[in-house]
Each structure stands twice: as structure tokens, then as C-alpha cells.
Amino acid sequence: FAGKGGVGKTSLAAWTADLLARTGHNVWMIDADTALSLGQASGLPGHALPEPLVRRADLVRQRIHAGGFLNLNPEVGDLPETLAVDVPLGGPPRPGTAPGRKRLIVMGAVTNAGGGCACDANALLKAVLAHLVMDRDEWVLVDLEAGVEHLGRGTVAHVDGLVVVSEPSMRSLLTGAEVGRMARDLGLDNQVLVVNRHTGGDVPDLPGLPGRTLTMPPLDGLARRQMTDASVLDLPEADAVDDTLRRLLTLLGR
């Protein structure tokens, strides 16, 4: 899930993860956005959130500088279980279905790309993402920023699809078009555009925007709750949200 900040991609990621878990799938939720809000959007209190990977200087030194040498292909197979916390379901599982497990890893975003420590953290972050996407036979949902910098070309080859999220505004759509273009340059062609808080009108055909589009209307239940509760789950509109997400997964071929 990628797009301009504030467009609702974290909400969409939280909703999708919860739907998948309620229908029996194990899901890894990866928060790779600067805002670090996927856990709270999924119902976790602030004190239960794990420390972001990019702030774990001990792990960065241990894995990237093991033996005194710079290792840009570190061993990370044990890290997902070490870094993750379990996330409760936001609603009842589908009748007759054993619920899946939702686990959250907070990676954070490397903001000081010129610094050596930041570059080391970025290498470890990319290695963990690559391991989850390439070596685990489970759902992996990544809440990205307005780009796909965390996904190298080798990892993208194993990514099933990209959800580009936008508001119904030209600035937001232009950012979405740039995200789509960058992802296609890496070989990620399976993309769907979700226009969030859409109240009507045609979505403009901008170069770079994904050709397949879904719209999500404003949700009154979410708007009423946002000042008192960070969670976006278990809304009055939950059934309608689930229906839209099922259409999204179908468009992605899942």
C-alpha cells in the first residue's frame, strides 16, 4: 500500500489484514511508513507497539557488521518472530473458519539517507522485507510511504501486487501516478488504484496511474471515532468495507 501521506493507506492496510485473518489466513503486517501508525490503526495501544527496527542499533550492528565486516546480505530468518507482536482481530472470524494470526513488525522509515548508520539500517530493513516476501508462504502486507524504496528489484519479483491509494485531488493523484510509474520501472505491473473518500465524479486518466480503479466513500463511522479512538476496525460500515476489500483482492488476482 503506497501513496501520498494522509490518504488512508494505513486504514486500507489495517482493514485488509483484518479481513484476511478473519477468513483464516496468517498475515504479516509491515509498518514501513514514517508515521508508524499501522499498529494503532489495528487496535493496539501505544504501549504495546514494538520498537521500530530502524531504531534497533544493536541489531543493525550485529547483523550488518558481523565479524567486523560490512554485510549487505545479512541472515535475518529469525528476526520476524523476534520483532513481531500479535495483533487481535477487529471482529468475529468467518463462521466455520479458524481465524488466522495477525503479526505486526514496525520497521519505520530511514530518514537520513546520507548517514552511514541510516544506510546500514536500510540494508537490514530491506533484508527482512525480502525474507518475508520471498521465503514465507503467508500473506505479507506492507504499509509504505509515497514510494517503493524499501522494495529492491529482486524483492519486487516476488510481490503479488501494489495498491496505490489516493484522495480525490489532483495533487494526491499525481503522487499516485508517480508511485505507479516507479513501481512499473521495477517490474511491478500488477497495480490497483483505490481512490479513498470519493464522493463522485470520474477519476482522471493520468499517465502512470494504475488502470484498474476502486473507490471508497467517506465513512461517517470512522469520522466520528477518530478524535477518541485510533483504531479503524469494527466500524458501523464494516460489512461495506469488507465488500470493497474483496473486490480489491479479486482485482489483484488473489
Describe the function of each predicted region:
Residues 182-254:
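C-terminal lobe/tail of nucleotide-utilizing enzymes
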Residues 107-113, 117-118, 129-151:
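Switch II (G3) loop of P-loop NTPases
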Residues 5-6:
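Walker A (P-loop) phosphate-binding loop of P-loop NTPases
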Residues 12:
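Hydrophobic positions on the alpha1 helix immediately C-terminal to the Walker A/P-loop
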Residues 19-98:
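N-terminal phosphate/diphosphate-binding loop that engages ATP/GTP or pyrophosphate donors
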Residues 1:
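Hydrophobic anchor at the beta1->P-loop junction of P-loop NTPases
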Residues 9:
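Conserved lysine of the Walker
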Residues 127-136, 150-170:
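Inter-motif core of Ras-like GTPase G domains
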